[in-house]
């Protein structure tokens, strides 16, 4: 399974998915090639993040991913529609992948757990999912704490760019 690079989401997903028994094939780091792929394939009026995440998916598929996980649903911007548009583009390109859109539990636990069931297939167990989600949540909190700390100390460094490789 692959997913897009969105902030530090990859760190969380690289913990969550193995805990759920899902093989992870992370896309390579975002490069000029990633951007070129997304710009070439996405609608011209699509925003830059949509193009980059599409490039992530194509590179993940080329590395062997047979499943794509993408957040979706409603939200404050067009982000909620990326997944639906990207699924159509990827299908039109002839890729045979399972595209799983994960809606926020904020808008309905039933859809959220339905997405999780699709992700884990026959390995469905409330306790397993609970442990995996709790682990991923803790990792997310630690990553956010690191991010906050890096912003607090960055200005004190002679070379603030020293933190760039860490965060």
Predicted feature locations:
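An N-terminal assembly and electron-transfer interface module characteristic of large anaerobic redox
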Residues: 1-167
């Amino acid at each position: 399974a692959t997913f897009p690079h969105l902030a530090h989401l990859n760190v969380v997903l690289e913990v969550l998915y193995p805990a759920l028994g899902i093989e992870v094939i992370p896309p390579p780091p975002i490069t000029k090639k990633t951007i070129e792929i997304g710009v070439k394939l996405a609608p011209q009026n699509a925003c830059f993040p949509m193009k980059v995440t599409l490039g992530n998916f194509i590179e993940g598929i080329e590395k062997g991913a047979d499943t794509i996980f993408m957040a979706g649903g409603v939200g404050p911007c067009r982000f909620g529609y990326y997944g639906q548009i990207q699924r159509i583009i990827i299908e039109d390109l002839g890729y045979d992948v399972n595209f799983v859109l994960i809606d926020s539990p904020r808008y309905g636990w039933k859809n959220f757990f339905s997405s999780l069931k699709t992700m884990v297939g026959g390995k469905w167990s409330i306790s397993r999912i609970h442990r995996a989600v709790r682990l991923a949540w803790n990792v997310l909190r630690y990553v956010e704490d690191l991010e906050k700390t890096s912003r607090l100390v960055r200005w004190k460094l002679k070379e603030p760019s020293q933190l760039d490789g860490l965060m």
